[in-house]
Amino acid sequence: MKYTVGVDIGTFETKAVLVNEVGEVEAQAHKPHKMLVPQPGWAEHRPNEDWWGDFCEVTNKILKMSSVKPEDIKGLACSAIGPCMLPVDNHGEPLMNGVLYGVDTRSHEEIDILNKIIGKSKILEICGNALTSQSVGPKILWLKRNKPEVFKKTAKILTSTCLLYTSPSPRDRVL
């Protein structure tokens, strides 16, 4: 029989489900984690622990609960909180905690700067949306302005799901 794993990384927990080819649930697991608030208006997760570590833990739990062999897993679907901002180095390793979606409001000054430089109407025309605390662009500008040493080392900006789907050497195999 073939199986599919679904994983959802949420603000306060990670959940996994294992379903067989006819859609029956074989196993479910979850793992709580905390949203870090290092300063008022900031919201973060520890990517290696809260995203990657929880992903590994819940997927291993459902495999053990079900006795399904990893080679019988034919599909993997991930959803996660977002949009988040995670700067990584050229090896794919996180350079800081992941900055969460709209609950993190640290980039309000950068939103104002971008609106003044580019113009609200031009941003709306290009993006189809206004800039808000949900937007990643202002958070990247915040990173450049407030953590230049991290920004210089940044090779890519990932989201939480991108961290799961990219496979730097320590993450080569999950199952």
Question: Which residues does each PLM region occupy?
Answer:
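Signature tryptophan residues that serve as conserved aromatic anchors
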Residues: 42, 51-52, 102, 142, ...
